[in-house]
A protein has these predicted regions:
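Conserved alpha-helix/loop element of class I SAM-dependent methyltransferases that forms part
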Residues: 47-65
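A short glycine-rich, Lys/Arg-flanked "PGG" loop and its adjoining helix->strand segment in the class I
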Residues: 148-160
Length: 254
């Protein structure tokens, strides 16, 4: 085995040690990662566990009695479950996780008011009494022409006072800053993945993920009716935001 091969077959752990890379011969795909998806994202995005905790905390401000909470692109289903478990102050609230990739189904454990479905969020019909919609790093994998219609569908089915809480990886406005962010993020990934894992994922996502910038994203959200759009989490180019649906007579006139 060459030195180059050795570098590809070992992975660095947070304590500075190395371990064999059991995934070294597997190409990156979300299906291949279905059994360890949450762990993979925790290692991929610095502060991801904090982001999810923040989303759960935010949910307590928006979830109401007799409404529905929708998590778009729920993967293993852990976020919607945590919201279900942490909002016991409301009654008759339904929690629904939606995922296109059916390989995640084995992780789903349903309750009377917690359900999971396999469906395409761009074409499915949404419940009309949504108090909260969440989506973590999902929109970047949706064709650009379908994003605004999806935002409109979310907005139209939210109750007044409801919220869309989401996170995305965004492009920087300037090329110099974009390069800085990418190199810093690459250095971070090298602490958790082999060079081969990083390269395989970049090649795969190159054709799947289509990033936008923050200005355009906010413009699109405002265009479909959202107000008071606020960033609550940020790390490198990864951003968490909350967009509110409020009555027009309560709009901030500033």
């Amino acid at each position: 085995m060459s030195e180059k091969d050795l570098n590809f077959s070992l992975i660095h752990t947070p304590d500075g040690q190395t371990r064999p890379d059991e995934q070294a011969d597997k190409k990156f795909s979300f299906t291949n990662l279905s059994k360890e998806f949450d762990d993979h994202i925790d290692r991929s995005i610095r502060g991801y566990s904090t982001l999810r905790t923040d989303v759960v905390s935010l949910s307590r401000y928006f979830v109401e009695n007799d409404t529905t909470v929708l998590d778009l692109g729920c993967s293993q289903g852990s976020l919607i479950r945590r919201m279900y478990e942490n909002n016991d102050h409301v009654r008759s609230t339904k929690y629904i996780g939606v995922e296109l990739n059916d390989s995640f189904q084995e992780h789903w454990k349903e309750e009377e008011e917690l359900k999971y479905i396999v469906d395409d969020i761009t074409t499915m019909e949404f419940p009309k009494n949504l108090s909260l919609v969440t989506s973590l790093f999902t929109f970047q994998f949706i064709p650009e022409r379908k994003r605004v219609p999806l935002m409109e569908k979310i907005y139209d089915n939210l109750i007044e006072g409801g919220a869309f809480v989401f996170s995305e990886k965004l492009l920087s406005i300037g090329g110099k800053v974009q390069n800085m962010m990418e190199f810093m993020y690459y250095d971070y990934k090298r602490e958790h993945f082999t060079e081969k894992e990083i390269l395989d994922k970049e090649i795969e996502l190159r054709h799947l993920a289509k990033l936008t910038n923050e200005d355009l994203l906010i413009k699109q959200l405002l265009g479909v009716g959202f107000r008071q759009i606020q960033t609550f989490w940020r790390n490198f180019n990864f951003v968490g935001m909350v967009a509110l649906k409020i009555p027009s007579n309560n709009w901030d006139k500033k």
